[in-house]
């Protein structure tokens, strides 16, 4: 009887030791990279919330940041990086939320994307006061064309979604194209898909003797500062909320004149094909 009690006591001690060990074991930290600019970071965090990864506080009209995470059951660490650089650090994190233009350029495929009800139109912008110039109207007409719409739909097959409404033949009847013959329109753009889309508009303008000079930028700041400083006639690289926020923070005078496309944000991983890394 004494031996039975002794064995029972030993078993009880072992159970308690194992229980305390399990309780004390730290849950693995899951690193998720997101874009660092305010609008895209907030957008990424909302996508993670929709996916059940974390829960955000109600921030009202303010953009959510990682400090607004209210519930973090998966022990997620948010890693911020400039939007264009997120694909390059994918190997160093468990997951990354990436804008599809940068993902396409890097040859990446998401395992989940934003819903079809989420739209952040990427826009052609000019400096305030230049909305009605013949250069601007000629540029808008060339982009808001059947040629560009067909290119977006056939090339990206939904990875990039066309937002052009009623399109035309590429020309504006109110523009004096003869006066623009021999002139250059300089526009700043991200490489993919913006510069590729603009290449189609370039051909449309060339038929009227107008050169579209496409300057490619790899970041989210220089296209706006160059436009504000008069080095560019226009830019096309970002969505409306980003441009609104940029104006508010920098006192710039950037206005958007055409919604062209939107890029569904997706979740990517070089290790997992789903959210199994959270388990």
Name each model feature, range by range.
Residues 82-83, 91-104, 191-192, 218-220, ...:
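Beta->alpha turn/N-cap motifs
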Residues 28-33, 180-192, 210-216:
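Short, well-ordered beta-strand elements
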Residues 60-88, 214-225:
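Short helix-initiation/N-cap motifs at beta->coil->alpha
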Residues 18-22:
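C-terminal motif of bacterial Sec signal peptides marking the signal peptidase cleavage site
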Residues 58-64, 140-178:
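Ligand-binding clefts/hinges and TM-proximal coupling segments of bilobed small-molecule sensing domains
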Residues 1-11:
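Bacterial N-terminal signal peptides that target proteins for export
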Residues 104-134, 140, 165-173, 257-269:
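Periplasmic-binding protein-like
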Residues 27-41, 45-47, 51, 137, ...:
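A conserved helix-loop-strand patch within extracytoplasmic ligand-binding domains
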